[in-house]
Amino acid sequence: MEDAQIIELFFARSEDAISDLDKKYGKLCHKLADNILASAQDAEECVNDAYLSTWHAIPPQRPESLPAFVGTLVRRCSITRYRANTAMKRNSHYDMCMEELETFLASPQQAMEEHYAARELAAAIERFLDTQSKENRVLFMRRYWYADSFAEIGKLLGITEGNARLRLTRMRKQLKTYLTEQEVLV
């Protein structure tokens, strides 16, 4: 079923909308939540919460990209749950992904508190990614949006785990230089 048809089911308030959404994007949503939370039960709850949020948001919203819309809801819910679960604990898979970027970026909480700065930073990162090859953009997004492991990224792109790690290290250095030149980082 096409995304436009699923969106029309939401507008018609058909109960099939959520089941069709789950059939098409359930695997993606669960993978995203699992990568952040590392708990199948919490991931399932976040995916269900995201589906409910989608039900309430459509209508009136009509997302241009249904997987991006639902993925963002899943990711936000998962990060909120993750923060609640690990308020005093550290060293999870998601922490390691974020710590790779935190060496030169503000912490995610600081960035959220400074909404304008976060938007400016996001726009600068998007511009940086526009200068990269498609494979490097996929590499970056799989690591820092989907929180995939180096092994998973390597398998997806047909490269070794070590190559994925090395390329991301180089990209982080390039990103830091780019953000400094753009005066996003001081």
Go through each PLM region and give its residues.
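DNA-recognition helix of helix-turn-helix
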Residues: 65, 79, 125-126, 136, ...
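Short, charged helix-capping/linker segments at alpha-helix termini
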Residues: 11-20, 30-49, 161, 184-186
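Sigma70-family region 2
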Residues: 11-12, 38, 48-66, 84-85
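Arg/Lys-rich amphipathic alpha helix in sigma70-family domain 2
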Residues: 72-94, 118
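Acidic, proline/glycine-rich intrinsically disordered inter-domain spacer in sigma factors
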Residues: 99-130
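Residue-level preference for hydrophobic side chains embedded in well-ordered alpha helices
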Residues: 21, 25, 29, 50, ...
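Short amphipathic alpha-helical interface segments enriched in basic and hydrophobic/aromatic residues
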Residues: 23, 30-34, 51-59, 75-83, ...
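Short helix-capping/turn signature of helix-turn-helix
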Residues: 24-26, 36, 131, 141-148
